[in-house]
Each structure stands twice: as C-alpha cells, then as structure tokens.
Amino acid sequence: MSAININQSNFQNEVMNSDKPVLLDFWAPWCGPCRMVVPIVEEIARERDDIKVGKINVDENPELAGQFGVMSIPTLVVMKNGKIVNQSMGAKPKSAILAML
C-alpha cells in the first residue's frame, strides 16, 4: 500500500481509529531533508502491511502540525491506539525509521 495523504478531514478515521500502528511523516514540499525522507517512507508503506503510513503536508495542515507540536520538519510520529508512542525530528535512514516502529 502507498502512503496516505492525511488532512484534517480524514485524520480521525485514518489515524485515530486505525487498527494498525500509524507512521506519520510531517513534511513540506520546500523542505530539502523532507524530500530525502519521502522515498524511504513510501518504500516502508509498500513493504509493510502491518502498519499504515500517512503523510501530512504542514503548509496545508497547520492545525495538525500544531496539534502534534511540530516545530521542525521532517518530523516522524508513530501512533498506536490513538496515542503517540514514538516521535523523531530530522531526516533518518530507513533502519532508524523502522526501529521507531
């Protein structure tokens, strides 16, 4: 499965009500480090059926970024049962992102 674009209208259903852990990637198109993380996140989404992967564009969804206290991007957040269980800022290699799960 590919990563899902998360916004205010689908956040509750896709993230909070998910029966799988959710990896959220807070990003923006102008962010260089974000562009390095996007292909890794997409690859994880395709490889792992046991998790859901969502991308949140902070320019289009500032309220979600604020809700998670995102101060710099990329920020990766892992949610389970509607709760944050892991969070990391900055570009990371695939192994470090997988270790968050």
Q: Where do the PLM segments sit?
A:
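Conserved Rossmann-like nucleotide-binding pocket used by diverse enzymes
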Residues: 2, 7, 27, 52-54
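A short beta-strand-turn-helix
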Residues: 3-22, 62
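Residue-level signature of catalytic and energy-coupling elements of molecular machines
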Residues: 11, 24, 41, 57, ...
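Short pre-active-site segment immediately N-terminal to redox-active cysteine/selenocysteine motifs
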Residues: 19-20, 26-30, 72
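Conserved helix-turn-beta segment immediately C-terminal to the redox Cys motif
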Residues: 19-21, 36-56, 60-62
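Structural micro-motif
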Residues: 22, 68-77, 92-95
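Conserved redox-active cysteine motifs that mediate thiol-disulfide chemistry
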Residues: 26-40
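Non-catalytic, surface beta->alpha helical segment in thiol-disulfide oxidoreductase systems
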Residues: 77-101
